[in-house]
Structures are given as structure tokens and as C-alpha cells.
């Protein structure tokens, strides 16, 4: 919230620039506003770190372990979501009472999904009771993240796809039971989910 307010204040400087030099003021204000978002965060180490690779080196198995560990909540960010084992695990989590919410890239999963597989997956998740949104405000929504129970974070290069599990060189890292790290990732997830649109199932 603080950064949003400061960004608005920086852009408001343009209103006082007058006609002369307004373009330069706009560039300065936009640069200042952009700088407010260019930040990193640090958290204290806690919990256990587990990692795996692919193809066929345990990456997908570790993702499934995280989903299977969830007792109350899963928050997920995806670019690709076509892995049958991952989708089945998410649906199983929902059926055992876990609140599952997902934000996924619109272009990859809807607009350019020529096979219809990605749309079928999103529909299956919605029909199972998961909350699914797609986001299109970025050229690519490339996050690959799962936050389980507000304490465990899974991330890495691993797309939730068959290719990532069986063909591509990928990595997965899980930080178990680190609530501060999970809090930061949840803030990022919320910022994307809030800008997404509910996926309307066609099945």
C-alpha cells in the first residue's frame, strides 16, 4: 500500500509541471515510481530446504509432496499447468477440504491454447471447486510458485507440465515451515490474483 501511495504521489507531480517541460516531468515521475517497486526482501532462515531437478530427478515428485502436505490452503501461480499428476493432486487437495486458489497466465493457457488441453485443465479445476483466475496484464505471467498453509513455499524454474517433468532441465526448491518467506510470497500472489479474471469454464 505504501508503495502504491508513493507511486501516485510521484505521478501527481506531472499535474504541476505546466505545459513547458511536462514530458520531462512525466519521465522523471515515472522513473521515481518505478524505483519504488525495484526492491528485494530478506527473511531469517528457518525451516528445512529441499530441492530436486528434472527430467526424472524428483522435481515433479517434490511438487506433489508439497501439494499433498497442505492441510488448509494452497495458493498457486503458474505459467503452464498441464501436468496430469499435478492437476490430480490439486483436485484431491480440494476434495479433502483444502482451499485451492490459482492464478495462471492467460495467453499460454487460453488465448494460445490451440490444443485445448490447458483450458480443459482449468475447467476441471474450477469444476472441482478450485478458484482459478487468469492474468493478462503482463507480456508473460511466468511465476511458478506454490504456497501451502501459509508456511511452505515451492518455487523454481519448473513449469507444472509434462515437458518440465519428463523432458526439460528444471529445478524445484521448497522451503518448509518458513512463515515469513511464505508471507512475502503470499503478498506477491495476492497482487497477481487481485488483477486476474475468474476463469469461466466451458464444460
Go through the PLM ranges and name each one:
Residues 17-19:
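N-terminal signal peptide c-region/cleavage motif recognized by signal peptidases
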Residues 25-56:
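N-terminal low-complexity, Pro/Thr/Ser-rich intrinsically disordered segments
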Residues 25-28, 40, 148, 152-203:
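Signature of lipid phosphatidyltransferase scaffolds
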Residues 48-72:
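Mature N-terminal segment immediately following signal peptide/propeptide cleavage
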Residues 50-55, 78-79, 130-132:
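Short, flexible loop segments at the rims of nucleotide/cofactor-binding pockets, characterized by
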Residues 65-127:
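Primarily the HKD phosphodiesterase
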Residues 80-84, 106-110, 138-141, 152-153, ...:
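Solvent-exposed loop/turn segments at secondary-structure junctions
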Amino acid at each position: 500500500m505504501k508503495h502504491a501511495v508513493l507511486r501516485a504521489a510521484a505521478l501527481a507531480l506531472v499535474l504541476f509541471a505546466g505545459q513547458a517541460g511536462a514530458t520531462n516531468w512525466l519521465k522523471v515521475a515515472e522513473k521515481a515510481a518505478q524505483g519504488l517497486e525495484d526492491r528485494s526482501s530478506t527473511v531469517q532462515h528457518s525451516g528445512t530446504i529441499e530441492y530436486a531437478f528434472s527430467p526424472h530427478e524428483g522435481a515433479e515428485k517434490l511438487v506433489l509432496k508439497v501439494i499433498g502436505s497442505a492441510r488448509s490452503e494452497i495458493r498457486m501461480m503458474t505459467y503452464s499447468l498441464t501436468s496430469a499428476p499435478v492437476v490430480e493432486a490439486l483436485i484431491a487437495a480440494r476434495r479433502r477440504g483444502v482451499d485451492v486458489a490459482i492464478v495462471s497466465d492467460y495467453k499460454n493457457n487460453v488465448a494460445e491454447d490451440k490444443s485445448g488441453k490447458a483450458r480443459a485443465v482449468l475447467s476441471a479445476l474450477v469444476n472441482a471447486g478450485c478458484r482459478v483466475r487468469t492474468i493478462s496484464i503482463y507480456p508473460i505471467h511466468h511465476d511458478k510458485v506454490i504456497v501451502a498453509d501459509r508456511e511452505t513455499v515451492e518455487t523454481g524454474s519448473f513449469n507444472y507440465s509434462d515437458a518440465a517433468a519428463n523432458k526439460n532441465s528444471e529445478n524445484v526448491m521448497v522451503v518448509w515451515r518458513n512463515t515469513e518467506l511464505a508471507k512475502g510470497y503470499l503478498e506477491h500472489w495476492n497482487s497477481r490474483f487481485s488483477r486476474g479474471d475468474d476463469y469461466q469454464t466451458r464444460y
